[in-house]
Amino acid sequence: MSLREKTVLAVKWNLLATVLSSIFGLISLWLLSHLLTTQDYGIISAALIICTFITVLLDFGISNSIIRSKELERIELSSLYVINITLGVIACLIALIFSQQIASLFNADDMLATQIKIMSIGFVISSFGLQAKALLTREMNFGAIAKITIASTFINFVSVVLLAWIYRSPWCIALAFLISATANTFLSTYAARPLRTYDLKFRFSAVKKHFRYGIQLVIDSMINQVSINTYPVLMSRLISLSAIGGYNIAYSISIGLFEKLNPVLSHTLFPALAKIGGDDSKLRSALLKITTYSAMINFPMLLGMMIIAPSLVDVFFDAKWQFIVPIVQVLCAAGAIRSLDTPVISVLLVKAQMYRNLYLGVAKLIVGIPLTWLLGHKAGLIGIVYGFLIIQVMNAICGYFFLLRPSIGVKGIDYLKSILIPSLHVAPMVLGGWVARYYFTPLGEILNMIAVASTCVLTYIITIYFSPANVIREFKELVTSNLIRKITKQ
């Protein structure tokens, strides 16, 4: 199978896993928003933020280092496996020992500390399966990875729904995380058994190069997590835990929902781009095309969600969550800008230049924290969210000048064109959607949402169909040929 065929197959499997995981996630989010109070949902959101942050330590960039390595010796894999497990134990101990202090950071009570303690056990369990997933990714065995993701997500979904329905308490989420982490580790280890040619031996000299590569990734990831999670932490201190709960729901049905497509691109692009990493000309061409293609998917979905947000929240959520409508809309705009980052990060990974993103991350923190604090004091929750939007605009502009141009020499006019083309093609959809929203207001929220969504989809399809741009014609032919191939196979 050629590299192109492997990449296309990988995208399909990742997309399937992402879609099903998103469906399970949305259903559980909807159920929990009805079953729990705003305060309880805030506790859950804070616990998940902490869990995500600590999980960054578990991998330490080792997985990406394994994926990009042309050859791997047995002692390398053995030593890296030992490091993963050691980091899992360290992360667990940190969470257990400092659970009370972490909870106080969010102005929370003992319930959050209990959540953290339960989740900490999952860090050790997860560490045993990290290398197995890295090896499967390196071999581009995305079919197995997708099946594992779907199975563990379904197990998490069933656990969350059943426990929350019975006990109506935040700790149910922590226990469900523990159950799904166990399932994911077991399934990953089993699927990767033919690739596991290592034991529990350790030699520091065998992992030096992986540390040099991984340290850039883990510091960058930690800075990124601090940057993202600064906003909910400030919400808890300036407003309340309920504000975090509302922000989490808004994020999940806007940026979070569509950001799940980013791993579909990054997890499949990285191994594929690694094969052409030595040819900057090919990398530039691939980056520009991928930027346009991903924007053609992300822009209409996020901006479409921004338009239907008032109806969506009114139809699916209780009155206690109506305050999240403007938050969803601002986050959708921020998400559209943020989606441009995925191809850039893939290129930096291939070129082993993640230190560039690290410096940019520090700059975003220096600007973002005081800006967000100021806007939060002035305008409350919506001010904090606007702070997030401003930082995303800054990141997109600086991303070209400090990341792309120095790493592979992309011309500014070419990169701007790759963004402007999808932006211009989505503009008629946005205009038509806003007009339809006000025109169909008398129909009621449910019919209004359906009518607006239909208008947006139809307008976008027509715009794409009649587009004179060559890259759009290529995009259209790619989508059409895949659909025809699927139909003729049936």
Go through the PLM ranges and name each one.
Residues V19-I23, V82-N107, T114, I118, ...:
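Alpha-helical transmembrane segments of multi-pass membrane transport and lipid-handling proteins
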Residues T55-R74, T137-R138, A250, S254-N298, ...:
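Helix-loop junctions and terminal segments of transmembrane helices
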Residues R4, V8, S65-R74, I125-T149, ...:
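Membrane-interface junctions at transmembrane-helix termini in multi-pass inner-membrane proteins
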Residues V410, Y415, G433-Q490:
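Membrane-proximal transmembrane or re-entrant/amphipathic helices at the cytosolic face
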Residues A10-G25, A176-S180, N184, S188, ...:
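Transmembrane helical elements of multi-pass membrane transporters/channels
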Residues L3-F60, L87-S99, I118, G122, ...:
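Signature of the first transmembrane helix
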Residues M1-L3, T7, G143, F186-N229, ...:
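Interhelical loop/hinge segments that connect adjacent transmembrane helices in multipass membrane
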Residues A113, K117-S120, K147-P194, K209, ...:
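Hydrophobic alpha-helical transmembrane segments
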